[in-house]
Amino acid sequence: MRRRETFRLAAGGSVAGLLSPRIARAEAEVERARRGLPSPKIQDVQVINTAPRGLRLCVVKILTDQDGLYGYGCATFTQRADLVGPAVERYLKPFLVGKPADRIDDTWQALYNSSYWRNGPVLNNAISGVDLALWDIKGRQAGMPVYQLLGGKLREAADCYSHASGNEIAETLDNARALMERGFRHVRIQV
């Protein structure tokens, strides 16, 4: 092999290495088009306020233009749950309707960076609900749980914790012990 041929092959390999992610994305788009699955567009954004066991939760539901394709995301900020819903409905919804549901990172960046003050806890929780709902849509489209889309299972189970509080330190400690007797290995204490 001559020097020029070696250089040409090496250069070709480098270019192919740079282009391969783009080619893979393009091939995926072609495959999607062949299957007749256009990119879903966000048609509506709804807020569901709920309070299991008295804990106020705000859930975001995103509906797409594809029949039966929707996603749920939790936008919980229990201290200001009554503000998260209006943030989704009045601020985020007008921006989201009509946008592609499969451009998750693009959407997150636009929502996060669109506010002069970089949002704060209420709007950040609203954005997290939208983000989770969009991932739920992608998982439903793929026919698999979101954790598989993100690389698969890391462990079989995850430890949960509970919260112990009380009016006095002794009461708080008693509540923590009771939780540990119920099987919790981790207890958050607030004095």
Annotated model-derived regions:
Residues 53-56, 128:
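Short, basic and Ser/Thr-rich N-terminal targeting/leader segments
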Residues 49, 77, 191:
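Residues that line or immediately flank small-molecule/substrate-binding pockets and catalytic motifs
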Residues 3-26:
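N-terminal export signals
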Residues 20-53:
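C-terminal segment of N-terminal export signals and the immediately downstream linker at the start
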Residues 131-165, 171:
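Glycine-rich, aromatic-flanked loop segments that form ligand/cofactor-binding clefts
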Residues 65, 69-141:
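Metal- or metallocofactor-binding catalytic centers and their adjacent structured scaffolds
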Residues 156-191:
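Metal-dependent enolase-superfamily TIM-barrel catalytic cores that perform enediolate-based chemistry
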Residues 58-66:
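Short beta-strand elements
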